[in-house]
């Protein structure tokens, strides 16, 4: 799954973009400042960044320059500043595209995909781990000639775990990514979804299993 870093000091914009990226099967990592974004990148790989210009501390121009020079990842500027001089400075800083606010989120996603294609970054809808193939477009699991369609949340949860084998995810991390920041339900819903996924994987005879890490969360293991 494509990993997209979104940096903006407006939490509403962060949540808005993240929710739409999620529906497009793009994993969003949101940060409120340039400094926080760089701290995240010390431990998390991303494929592309969407960043604001006007932020406290490190501004978008500085952040863009650092992302290009130190991490060599594509950047899209998303900003209310529409002066030609700002656009010139942004492209000098290394941005690959420039989108002004207010913006259409669908257009932003089109531009993200276009930049990814330019960099030959894979945003295909399928991934295979062990003997299991996951198809995001159809929410399907396949092992040999057996195919199973999952409910949306179950598929998103399994796909998130499968993209990072052996990485432990807490319930809080899972809820934030799959159900969103404003989810107010019981966190035990994660356990219910995990139980169902285990049953489905067993029925398919998948080599992938979901393991419980006591006191921490869940991870996937591939038994080949």
Swiss-Prot record:
Transmembrane segments: none annotated. GO terms for cellular component: cytosol; protein-DNA complex. SMART domains: REC, Trans_reg_C. Phosphorylated by HssS. SUPFAM superfamilies: CheY-like (SSF52172). It is found in: Cytoplasm. One of its GO terms (molecular function) is phosphorelay response regulator activity. The modification 4-aspartylphosphate is found at residue 52. One of its GO terms (biological process) is regulation of DNA-templated transcription. Keywords: Activator, Cytoplasm, DNA-binding, Phosphoprotein, Transcription, Transcription regulation, Two-component regulatory system, Virulence. Member of the two-component regulatory system HssS/HssR involved in intracellular heme homeostasis and tempering of staphylococcal virulence. Phosphorylated HssR binds to a direct repeat sequence within hrtAB promoter and activates the expression of hrtAB, an efflux pump, in response to extracellular heme, hemin, hemoglobin or blood. This is Heme response regulator HssR. The gene is hssR.
């Amino acid at each position: 799954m494509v990993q997209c870093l979104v940096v903006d000091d407006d939490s509403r914009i962060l949540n808005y973009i993240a929710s739409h990226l999620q529906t497009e099967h793009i994993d969003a990592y949101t940060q409120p400042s340039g400094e926080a974004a760089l701290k995240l990148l010390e431990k998390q790989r991303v494929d592309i960044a969407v960043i604001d210009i006007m932020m406290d501390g490190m501004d978008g121009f500085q952040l863009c320059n650092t992302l290009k020079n130190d991490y060599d990842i594509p950047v899209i500027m998303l900003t209310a500043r529409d002066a030609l001089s700002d656009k010139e400075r942004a492209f000098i800083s290394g941005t690959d595209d420039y989108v002004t606010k207010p913006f259409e989120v669908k257009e932003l996603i089109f531009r993200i995909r276009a930049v990814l294609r330019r960099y030959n970054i894979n945003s295909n809808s399928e991934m295979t781990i062990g003997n299991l193939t996951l198809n995001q477009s159809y929410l399907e699991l396949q092992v040999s000639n057996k195919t199973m369609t999952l409910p949306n949340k179950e598929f998103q949860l399994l796909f998130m775990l499968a993209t990072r084998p052996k990485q432990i995810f807490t319930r809080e991390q899972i809820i934030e990514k799959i159900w969103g920041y404003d989810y107010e339900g019981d966190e035990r819903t994660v356990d219910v979804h995990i139980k169902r996924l285990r049953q489905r994987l067993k029925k398919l005879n998948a080599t992938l299993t979901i393991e419980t890490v006591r006191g921490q969360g869940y991870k996937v293991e591939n038994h080949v």
